[in-house]
Amino acid sequence: MYSADPIIYVVHDFLSKDECEEFINIAKKIGQEDINIYRVNHDASNLLHETSKRLSILVQTPIRNAEKYLVTTFNEQTITTETIDSLNPETQSKLMEKDSGGQRLLSLMGALSEKDRLEVTFSELDLNIKLQTGEILVLHNCYEGSISPNPKSKYTIRATNKTVSWYLKLIFRERLIK
């Protein structure tokens, strides 16, 4: 565990080499969507369906509460900005409506490319976490037991090498996404 407020921990060797390659291959088949972000269904293949179930068990939240996987490519030159995945109830209430699953409670992140390392920086915590291929970082976006965003959950993610890196993110909502 790296932090208790917000809860941040890393699970080593969670994704197999085959699972990492499957995410990359399916994203490549989808083609370019939003510059370098590919939205991948939880059941895009039998292997990813099983991976989705394992991730759901890891965070003890139904996979039906999760948004689609975001598989992203970037390199050392990619300009990244500070991100907070939780939704602000005052300004983003439409995104929190019943059908959209409510608040974004958990974010899972991982490096997919062989020999890649991703660095996740939490500026509010003065914390840098380097993720290796197959590792999963789990971040609780809200205060414990609430849907109020924790401002300390802001992060920046970047590649630590010059080649194209593949990165995975999965966000779990508070309720079923319809």
Report each predicted region and the residues it spans.
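Fe(II)/2-oxoglutarate oxygenase catalytic core
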Residues: 1-137, 142-178
